[in-house]
Amino acid sequence: MITVNVDLGERAYPIHIGADLIGRTELFAPHIAGASVTIVTNTTVEPLYGDTLRAALAPLGKRVSTVVLPDGEAYKNWETLNLIFDGLLEQHADRKTTLIALGGGVIGDMTGFAAACYMRGVPFIQVPTTLLSQVDSSVGGKTGINHPLGKNMIGAFYQPQAVIADIGALSTLPDRELAAGVAEIVKTGAIADAAFFDWIEANVGALTRRDPDALAHAVKRSCEIKAGVVAADEREGGLRAILNFGHTFGHAIEAGLGYGEWLHGEAVGCGMVMAADLSVRTGHLDEASRARLCRVVEAAHLPTRAPDLGDARYVELMRVDKKAEAGAIKFILLKRFGETIITPAPDDAVLATLAATTR
């Protein structure tokens, strides 16, 4: 097992990475102070890992309840969030009740938001079971739900007590979900660590084949990078925005098609291709680097052509973005691997990118 620490002073927490961690009681024990625990999971993950987690919690002598939600991005909304609150209230959960998010990014985001809101804040633990949630969404305290007009526009910054990333859970992940997680790994290397990007380029096949050593290294390095960024800029005042490379275009794809039509990682993969194209058109990135990025995204079995939503619709959706200021769209663009710039882009360059990258 490897442990990466997120250094946030009194709110620091560990990220434990390794195989067969969901069943290890000692990883949960230090982070559960109250008398009760509520596991939040979904209809896909519950039959796979619910019993394992409950067995791990049993020696602690806590009252354990489970809320099982429908699976998918389409359910990341107020209605589903209220199912968590219903479960907490029915179980008479108090301020010391610990929530455990057992699932992918949707479960983690909603459980974290519920924890931030219930009784104005209760502790929670992330147990991410998808590659995307292990390398990205479970780390850093971003929680929330979608709105029909924008992705993740309603939420809170609220840090977990711990992240327990069980690499073994990736063995049950569908190929499409695995590829979606590789997208966030590619993003992390592209924005922050050129040497890591080189490694990803050389090992993308091993990642898609689920080589355990490759996956463990990718999760570890991605978490190290994100932990460093979050420690420096927890609330996305500046530096943390670089983690949104590919997300401005990607969120527009998700909202434009309807949440759940494309997986988040698929939209981010394609969004990185679009952002790299715009980086070249605005004079920040060389063509050879753009081509390298596109090849890696394609090798990860991710889409590289965006849906044709229409130029006006793309622009409209990208204006509903947390980085936008006074209606001006800000993009995370590449200067070289490991270095980004946060900047507006000329309308003609954006339109040219849309023309070149949509089908």
Curated annotation (Swiss-Prot):
Gene3D superfamilies: 3.40.50.1970, Dehydroquinate synthase-like - alpha domain. Zn(2+) binds at E184, H247, H264. Its main location: cytoplasm. Pfam families: DHQ_synthase, DHQS_C. GO terms for molecular function: 3-dehydroquinate synthase activity; metal ion binding; nucleotide binding. NAD(+) binds at residues 71-76, 105-109, 129-130, 142, 151. Binds 1 divalent metal cation per subunit. Can use either Co(2+) or Zn(2+). Its cofactor is Co(2+); Zn(2+); NAD(+). Keywords: Amino-acid biosynthesis, Aromatic amino acid biosynthesis, Cobalt, Cytoplasm, Lyase, Metal-binding, NAD, Nucleotide-binding, Zinc. It catalyses: 7-phospho-2-dehydro-3-deoxy-D-arabino-heptonate = 3-dehydroquinate + phosphate. Belongs to the sugar phosphate cyclases superfamily. Dehydroquinate synthase family. Catalyzes the conversion of 3-deoxy-D-arabino-heptulosonate 7-phosphate (DAHP) to dehydroquinate (DHQ). This is 3-dehydroquinate synthase. The lineage of its organism: Bacteria, Pseudomonadati, Pseudomonadota, Betaproteobacteria, Burkholderiales.
